[in-house]
Amino acid sequence: MASERQKKIRNFCIIAHIDHGKSTLADRLLEMTGVLTEREMEDQVLDTMEIERERGITIKAQAVRMVYKAKDGEEYILNLIDTPGHVDFNYEVSRSLAACEGAILVVDAAQGIEAQTLANVYLALDHDLEILPVINKIDLPSAQPDVVKKEIEDVIGLDASEAPLISAKNGINIEAVLESVVKNVPPPEGDENAPLRALIFDSYYDSYKGVIVYIRVKEGTLKLGDKVRMMYTNKEFTVTEIGYMKPGGLVPGTQLSAGEVGYFAASIKNVKDTRVGDTVTTADNPAKEPLPGYKKVNPMVFCGIYPADGSKYGDLRDALEKLQLNDASLTFEPESSVALGFGFRCGFLGLLHMEIIQERLEREFDFDLVTTAPSVIYKVTKTNGETLYIDNPTNLPPPAEIKTMEEPIVKATIMTPTEYVGNIMELAQERRGIYKDMTYIDEGRVMLTYELPLNEIIYDFFDALKSRTKGYASLDYEMLGYRESDLVKLDIMLNGEIVDALSFIVHREKAYARGRRIAEKLKEAIPRQQFEVPIQACIGGKIIARETVKAYRKDVLAKCYGGDITRKKKLLEKQKEGKKRMRQIGTVEVPQEAFMSVLKLDT
């Protein structure tokens, strides 16, 4: 049973599809409960990174404490845990949800339910959260609250008859949301006197205090000065500061008890010691079991990142280390390429994560970067029975040693207006998709389920999906596992030399078309030399496509007026010999633009 103190606490989060008004609603709740004065208000208070605001997405989880005086005259402590909404950060979302008892589901009155809304709702249901539907943007002329209510009931199976109709932008009916939280979200439970068990749902690095760890205390009490142990990493630290969060700052206190959400600092030097999902307990009276649900997050998408200016290699390492302080899911290791020099092989949770890291490197650290084509992890079984996981095409063993190759497969859920179903099916087939299911949500919208290779999604599937549906379709995907596939390594040779940065692993059916396109693109991008340069795409020893960059040549016959043909032949032969010798000793400089144009190929 919840104690008297716990009965006054509500821990909840807000889940929504991108652009349905999650951050705006959070702003209004903060304003309504007086956490922020109007002067302090700026849009999307909880999205602290510039990129978060620009793209209108939430990347890092945040947490805020509000005090609200309800209509029943009691004061309640409301802890809002802001979650990322994007599929790449799915694990972070699941840990943030595990720190709550309830979730506000924000649905746009004009758009209805979207793919990511569904994905997050299912996650919330997995954690047994009380879900409160809220219909936002009712001030829009195209709003259809009744249709959306019916959609919520039909698709998710939630009773939406009581759902507050609000406009977060104009501050309409916000109080109804707070009342609904107080009334419907169950208070936290947990014995304050039991051994401490607290869930880490986020952490970030502060250059003065070390790592600041965000926790939800499930059982027991954590006090200032306690010696704590992380149950998965087994590291021990002494708490130097403890308290709760408010926008733009921390409020130090003396202790956190079961049911509360707060933070602590303990002079921790590395974010890797405070893994999201880990359990914190005290060293002198440890809990027997950690909290369930911890997973080590593994990167899914890899690419090489190189500084355009080779002398900046050291600076790039420093920048990646700084980003890693706040982002334990980013991995990188040094690699070198004949074509691009020294750089790093970086691992990311997904495409959005990769784009954000690249953008932050370019924006916050002012780098000019060259990135190689993204690749996924392939599972290779060799003829001697050994299993390898390959994230870089250059590490692939020779074809004779490979018994089977498997690639990661995802389950993709696509929501679309009915008129675009044909286009989407065509796109999914082009990308080797396997059709699984199709459900009509209402007269105008359909939910399609496909199994697709991750390799086909990571280039530009999302862009292609948007362009074929005029921007109306939404996509969500989750990992299914590995499946055997007929994959080959496609190498590009310039002047007989393999260019390592342009190697790809590709499905055999697509290899010819891909090789042909790359060769054509390189032919346009590589400047002419004094000798002719053959560009060849090959699989193993077999050339599947070839283009030639023609040589510049001097007109050696200009000074021959008439005269014997053998004289002309002699001069041409001599020129040919010279070009041949030049070609043997010449090297081809590949300009940066040539790499970029190949990597931007529509795949």
Swiss-Prot record:
Catalytic activity: GTP + H2O = GDP + phosphate + H(+)
Membrane topology per record: Peripheral membrane protein
InterPro entries: EF-4, EFG_III/V, EFG_V-like, EFTu-like_2, G_TR_CS, LepA_C_sf, LepA_CTD, LepA_IV
Amino acids binding GTP: 19-24, 136-139
Principal subcellular localisation of the protein: membrane
Cell compartment(s), UniProt: Cell membrane
Pfam families recorded: EFG_C (PF00679), GTP_EFTU (PF00009), GTP_EFTU_D2 (PF03144), LepA_C (PF06421)
tr-type G domain: residues covered: 7-189
Keywords: Cell membrane, GTP-binding, Hydrolase, Membrane, Nucleotide-binding, Protein biosynthesis
Gene3D superfamilies found in the cross-reference section: 3.30.70.240, Elongation factor 4, C-terminal domain, Elongation Factor G (Translational Gtpase), domain 3, P-loop containing nucleotide triphosphate hydrolases, Translation factors
Domain of life: Bacteria
BP terms from Gene Ontology: positive regulation of translation
Molecular function as annotated in GO: GTP binding; GTPase activity; ribosome binding; translation elongation factor activity
Record CDD domains: EF4_II, EF4_III, LepA, lepA_C
EC number(s) reported in the record: 3.6.5.n1
GO cellular component terms given for this protein: plasma membrane
Role played: Required for accurate and efficient protein synthesis under certain stress conditions. May act as a fidelity factor of the translation reaction, by catalyzing a one-codon backward translocation of tRNAs on improperly translocated ribosomes. Back-translocation proceeds from a post-translocation (POST) complex to a pre-translocation (PRE) complex, thus giving elongation factor G a second chance to translocate the tRNAs correctly. Binds to ribosomes in a GTP-dependent manner.
Assigned protein family: Belongs to the TRAFAC class translation factor GTPase superfamily. Classic translation factor GTPase family. LepA subfamily.
Protein name: Elongation factor 4
Gene encoding the protein: lepA
